[in-house]
C-alpha cells in the first residue's frame, strides 16, 4: 500500500472564536484520508523561516524539524498577513506545491486589485470607487448612483459589506466608520439590482468547475450562507466553464470559489 501524500492546511484560528476550526477545514480533514491524503493543520506563525541558497527538505514547526509536505492549502482568508505570505513563498521556493500560491493569495485579499486586473483584461465589472475621508456623496451619486454598496477592502463571508440606499444613508454610515476607524480602506460599488439577495457561487479547481450553487438571502441583500441565506444546486454550462477558466488564468489561481 503506497504512503499517503502529506499536506498542510495553513490556518490560523481567529482570536476569541469558540469553534477553533472552520467548517471547511474540518471537512478537508474528514475526507482527505478517503482520497489518499494525510492532512495536518499548521499555524503559519509556528513556522520558522530560514532562507538560504542551498534549499532544504525539512522546516521547523513549533520548534521541531519536520519533513516538507507534498502540498499546502492556505486557508487564512483575511487573516493572511505579511508573515503568512512569506511562509507560503518560502514553501514555494523549496518546491512545495501551494494551492494557491502567495501571489494569488495576496491578490484574493485585495478586492480592488482583483477588479483592476479583471477590468484590464476586458471582463465586465461593476463601477467601483476607492474612497478616503471625507467622502463627497454628491460625487458618488454622479459617478455610481444609489443604492451603493460599501465594502471594506478586506473581508469574508459577507462581513464588511453594507448597502446605502441614498445620500443620507451613505453619509450616516461613513461618519460612523470614520469615527471608529479613520484609516479604514473602503470601496463604493455599483449595486446590481438584479442580484439583490441572490448570487451564484462557483467552486473550481484548475480550469474545471467542481460545484456550483445559487445562494438566496432570507432577508436583505446579502446572500451569504453564513449570513443566514439558503443554497440550492446550480446547473452550469459551457459558458460558465469558459468564463471561470479565463478568470482563474488571469488571476493566476489554481483553486477559487
Predicted regions and their residues:
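ATP-binding N-terminal substructure of ATP-dependent carboxylate-amine bond-forming enzymes
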Residues: 1-99, 104
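A long amphipathic alpha-helix within ATP-dependent nucleotide-binding catalytic cores
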Residues: 221-257
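A short glycine-rich, hydrophobically flanked beta-strand micro-motif that places a catalytic Asp/Glu
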Residues: 188-190, 200, 253-257
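Generic beta-strand structural signal
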Residues: 100, 130, 204-205
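Active-site nucleotide/adenylate-binding loops and adjacent lid/helix of ATP-dependent enzymes
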Residues: 2-29, 66-67, 91-95, 103-189, ...
Amino acid at each position: 500500500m503506497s504512503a499517503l501524500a502529506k499536506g498542510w492546511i495553513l490556518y490560523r484560528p481567529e482570536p476569541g472564536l469558540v469553534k477553533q476550526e472552520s467548517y471547511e477545514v474540518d471537512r478537508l480533514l474528514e475526507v482527505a484520508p478517503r482520497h489518499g491524503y494525510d492532512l495536518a493543520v499548521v499555524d503559519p506563525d509556528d513556522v520558522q523561516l530560514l532562507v538560504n541558497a542551498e534549499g532544504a527538505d525539512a522546516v521547523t514547526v513549533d520548534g521541531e524539524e519536520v519533513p516538507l509536505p507534498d502540498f499546502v492549502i492556505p486557508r487564512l482568508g483575511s487573516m493572511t498577513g505579511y508573515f503568512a505570505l512569506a511562509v507560503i513563498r518560502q514553501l514555494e521556493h523549496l518546491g512545495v506545491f501551494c494551492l494557491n500560491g502567495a501571489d494569488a493569495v495576496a491578490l484574493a485579499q485585495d478586492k480592488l486589485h482583483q477588479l483592476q486586473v479583471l477590468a484590464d483584461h476586458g471582463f465586465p465589472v461593476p463601477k467601483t470607487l476607492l474612497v478616503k475621508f471625507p467622502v463627497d456623496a454628491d460625487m458618488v451619486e454622479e459617478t455610481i448612483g444609489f443604492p451603493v454598496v460599501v465594502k471594506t477592502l478586506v473581508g469574508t463571508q459577507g462581513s464588511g459589506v453594507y448597502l446605502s440606499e441614498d445620500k443620507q444613508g451613505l453619509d450616516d454610515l461613513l461618519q460612523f466608520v470614520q469615527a471608529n476607524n479613520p484609516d479604514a480602506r473602503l470601496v463604493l460599488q455599483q449595486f446590481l439590482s438584479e442580484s439583490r439577495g441572490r448570487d451564484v457561487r462557483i467552486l473550481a479547481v484548475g480550469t474545471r468547475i467542481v460545484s456550483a450553487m445559487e445562494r438566496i438571502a432570507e432577508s436583505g441583500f446579502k446572500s451569504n450562507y453564513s449570513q443566514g441565506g439558503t443554497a440550492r444546486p446550480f446547473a452550469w454550462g459551457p459558458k460558465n466553464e469558459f468564463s471561470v477558466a479565463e478568470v482563474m488564468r488571469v488571476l493566476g489561481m489554481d483553486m477559487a470559489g
